[in-house]
């Protein structure tokens, strides 16, 4: 199904295809409905909500994440909290019907291990929301894969370089599911990424490899951060531009790098940090933040006290947005990258002398 929504508050339209996941936005529309070519800064409601249904992680407790070189930003090896209740999830979904396109199910653990996983997927579809999620694959079964085929738009498997990783990918592919690989790109993994892209060495049949930039949050260390002046970063983005038998994508945290190093990627296809502009994160504890990497809870708002729309328009979220609004005023590429990550400026792949990081409002 395809649909178009008119955001009357910010004067633009967006379209979404529930089958393919295709998503497009117009520019700001003038009084005659003509596209001005100016990108709208934000929507009146998040178009994608990262719903952290998991409060604890079976996979993380085994230590296998750390063994694979992944520093869990949610500290899944250390923190144990209750999973999100079905009633809380339904409350989120019912508010989002007709306003939000997708729910990215996540949190501190594998969403497919939630005790009410099937019911959660059904609630999504009942409210015209497409559920997607990322899994370690550790607990994947043919029965879970069948549920994914029935309800999900796509499933991503985290690249843990383990037998269960490959088994989960194969299980999902055999079930006919659009399957992606999520690959955390850090100092300890970029050489492998370049090598695998050079040799097209990812499982046959996958839809895409999505590269997620390592951040120093939770168990993630600063030592594993990449720097813009590391020559391997330029080599990596050169491979991103090369044709492969699978699609290559990236999270918005990597967009400044694509702007800096890529020459053949259409700027219109890039969307920089959408936190607080087109997306947000809601944890199992019903705390809402512009981005799930706000592990210091600088911008959190409790949904026990207000609706999602109220939280979206809160002072905390506005403080987050103002960091992007005030970034890099003298740079001609400001509208494309908005200064990059407002939470961790140190991860941004930019070496421009026009770079300016707006100080956080108190």
Predicted regions and their residues:
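A C-terminal junction/extension of Radical SAM enzymes
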Residues: 1-10, 14, 208-296, 336
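The −1 position to Zn-ligating cysteines in a subset of zinc-ribbon hairpins
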Residues: 56, 64, 68-71, 272, ...
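Canonical Radical SAM [4Fe-4S] cluster-binding loop centered on the CxxxCxxC motif
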Residues: 40-87
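Flexible mid-to-C-terminal extensions adjoining Fe-S/redox cofactors in radical SAM and related proteins
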Residues: 1, 7-10, 20, 45, ...
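Flexible, glycine- and charge-enriched loops at secondary-structure boundaries
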Residues: 79-86, 110, 226-230
């Amino acid at each position: 199904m395809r649909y178009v929504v008119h955001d009357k508050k910010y004067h633009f339209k967006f379209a979404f295809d529930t089958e393919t996941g295709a998503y497009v936005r117009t520019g700001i529309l003038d009084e005659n409905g003509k596209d001005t070519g100016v990108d709208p800064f934000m929507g009146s409601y998040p178009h994608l909500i990262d719903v952290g249904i998991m409060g604890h992680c079976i996979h993380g407790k085994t230590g296998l994440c750390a063994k694979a070189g992944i520093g869990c930003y949610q500290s899944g090896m250390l923190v144990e909290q209750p999973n999100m209740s079905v009633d809380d999830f339904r409350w989120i979904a019912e508010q989002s019907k007709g306003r939000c396109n997708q729910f990215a199910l996540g949190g501190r653990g594998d969403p497919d291990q939630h005790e009410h996983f099937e019911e959660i997927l059904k609630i999504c579809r009942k409210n015209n929301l497409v559920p997607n999620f990322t899994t370690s694959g550790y607990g994947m079964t043919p029965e879970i894969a069948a549920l994914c085929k029935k309800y999900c738009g796509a499933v991503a498997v985290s690249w843990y370089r383990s037998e269960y990783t490959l088994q989960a990918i194969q299980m999902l592919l055999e079930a006919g599911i659009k399957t992606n690989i999520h690959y955390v790109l850090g100092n300890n993994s970029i050489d492998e990424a370049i090598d695998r892209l050079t040799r097209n060495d990812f499982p046959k049949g996958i839809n895409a490899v999505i590269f997620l930039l390592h951040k120093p949050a939770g168990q993630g260390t600063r030592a594993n951060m990449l720097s813009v002046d590391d020559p391997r970063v330029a080599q990596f983005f050169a491979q991103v531009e090369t044709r492969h038998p699978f699609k290559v994508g990236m999270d918005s945290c990597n967009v400044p790098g694509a702007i800096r190093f890529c020459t053949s990627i259409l700027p219109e296809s890039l969307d920089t940090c959408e936190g607080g502009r087109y997306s947000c994160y809601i944890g199992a504890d019903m705390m809402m933040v512009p981005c799930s990497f706000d592990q210091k809870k600088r911008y959190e708002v409790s949904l026990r006290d207000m609706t999602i729309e109220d939280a979206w328009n809160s002072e905390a979220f506005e403080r987050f947005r103002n960091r992007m609004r005030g970034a890099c005023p003298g740079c001609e590429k400001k509208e494309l990258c908005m200064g990059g990550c407002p939470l961790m400026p140190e991860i941004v792949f930019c070496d421009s002398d026009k770079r300016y990081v707006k100080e956080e409002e108190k």
